[in-house]
């Protein structure tokens, strides 16, 4: 497993994809419900990785602290699980949710943290983890991988709006994806046109529930009573770190770019865990 320290979490209260183009485009992109949900989840992951998990690791060195380590790990799992649920709620295509998001503003993240710390609410929140089977189905249409302006692989959403490029010294495949001979600069510029950004975010918002379900239903996080001590602390810590790693890659897909998470992005996409279509082999 890749050490958690190798994950490059953002250093700010409002993380933006490093490939997000101009500030105006980035702000418009950030206001979309789905991307906002991913950013809040990414902030939670950043805080969890930088503060809670290092404490767990240090305390876990002492053999007489197994009970305390297990409790802290379970609290971390509950917090991360509640963050996933919060992301699902924020991404729902509801006008009421959109208006609520505008009015609540920065208070939303604090409310999400309060829900995570309140053990009494976790039973109700956990019911959202088991989604109806149609929510797990991916769209039948996909657009193949393209390149960003820094020449790193990224996943193009199936709903991305094709842009009418010039025909000089360029090629395109059947799905309308720019060919490799095209200028990387032009690909980057047009990938962040407003209509393309909004279409990608809408498509990714539709896939959010499936992505979250893939993490949680695969038992990467311990689900159940926090007082249950059947799972050894070592195995519990491995599951939690795996969930954080998977969530980091999900955030990368959400931003439609591999935002510094390393080479495992390609491995996860190859396994079709979060892909919007068939795996690229």
From Swiss-Prot:
Residues 90-119, 136-186 are annotated as: Disordered. It is found in: Virion tegument; Host nucleus matrix. One of its GO terms (molecular function) is zinc ion binding. Pfam families: Gene66 (PF02053). Phosphorylated. Keywords: Host nucleus, Late protein, Virion, Virion tegument. GO terms for cellular component: host cell nuclear matrix; viral tegument. Induction: Expressed late in the infection cycle. The keyword S-adenosyl-L-methionine does not apply. Belongs to the herpesviridae US10 family. This is Virion protein US10 homolog. It comes from Psittacid herpesvirus 1 (isolate Amazon parrot/-/97-0001/1997) (PsHV-1).
């Amino acid at each position: 497993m890749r050490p958690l320290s190798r994950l490059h979490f953002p250093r700010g209260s409002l993380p933006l994809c490093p490939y997000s183009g101009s500030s105006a485009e980035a702000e418009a992109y950030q206001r979309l419900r789905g991307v906002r949900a991913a950013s809040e989840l990414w902030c939670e992951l950043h805080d969890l990785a930088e503060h809670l998990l290092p404490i767990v690791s240090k305390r876990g060195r002492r053999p007489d602290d197994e009970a305390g380590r297990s409790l802290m790990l379970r609290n971390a799992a509950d917090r991360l699980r509640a963050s996933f649920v919060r992301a699902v709620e924020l991404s729902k295509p509801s006008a009421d949710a959109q208006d609520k998001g505008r009015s609540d503003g920065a208070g939303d993240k604090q409310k999400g943290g309060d829900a995570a710390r309140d053990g009494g609410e976790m039973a109700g929140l956990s019911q959202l983890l088991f989604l109806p089977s149609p929510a797990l189905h991916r769209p039948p249409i996909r657009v193949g991988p393209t390149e960003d302006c820094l020449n790193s692989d990224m996943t193009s959403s199936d709903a991305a709006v094709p842009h009418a490029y010039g025909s000089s010294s360029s090629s395109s495949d059947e799905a309308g994806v720019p060919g490799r001979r095209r200028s990387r600069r032009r690909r980057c510029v047009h990938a962040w046109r407003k209509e393309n950004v909004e279409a990608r975010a809408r498509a990714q918002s539709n896939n959010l529930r499936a992505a979250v379900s893939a993490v949680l239903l695969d038992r990467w996080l311990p689900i159940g009573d926090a007082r249950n001590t059947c799972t050894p602390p070592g195995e519990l810590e491995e599951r939690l770190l795996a969930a954080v790693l998977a969530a980091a890659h999900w955030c990368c897909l959400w931003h439609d770019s591999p935002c510094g998470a390393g080479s495992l992005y390609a491995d996860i996409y190859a396994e079709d865990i979060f892909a919007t279509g068939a795996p690229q082999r």
